[in-house]
């Protein structure tokens, strides 16, 4: 065989190897450690610290600057990481965890703003589905976009408006002293690609929480404190009432959670989310994790402790107490630990 033939054979072999490496079946898994684990992604550093402190046989892995801690927590093999605030951070850290560890289930926890006015500061909300209402089509006014030839059709742009009962969700309008101001913000479904729906992919608005994990969450009975550990200055003393929330926090399961790239402090938009979506809570990470979980076929659940009623000043004193006393991270960790206990002993 001459050099020309050797070159051709080598080129064909290299091309075949490259093609094989690009196929979905050749995707590498658990690049760092391959013990089956529950992945815990915390958006709140203090809570992650509590969980890591209680983890048995902890081992820290630093991947792309992110510290992942493996070990056993309440008898369950886990890997714990802090995502930090934002949809993008949540997406990147969750996918990094999925790539480098053998994650069989995902748990997200952290702080959130309340949307349902019936809830109180300190309540821990466990929604049964999550959505991203700030994925929008921003029209010039509140007229239904007809970009692709008919009302509400934006398919030629690779987009789809979110709808309820077959009708697009009405756009948000801002009330002002001069009257209602249309924003032209129409909610969209977002596009997700998985091994199961490739190559066409699909549009989704809601990402349902895993039914088995939700059943365990409904059964747990964690004791949630009204005063955080820092509310008591000296051992045996009464807690400082200014560092306690007024209403004993409860665990509330069900309803829709929503996430977005904005920090929500607008009471009008909060009301809009509650009226149009019956949203229970708003934050900046979970729906992104849910998208990653769905794309990777990994069941997930999320726990969120309410820091306030988003944009409502009347809850400011309780919000201060929640953070200053350490109550936020204490109650969040209590729910996560109770869930792991329940998960370990599930039938």
Regions found by a protein language model. Name each.
Residues 22-347:
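Accessory terminal and edge-of-domain segments that mediate assembly/interaction
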Residues 9-18:
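Bacterial N-terminal signal peptides
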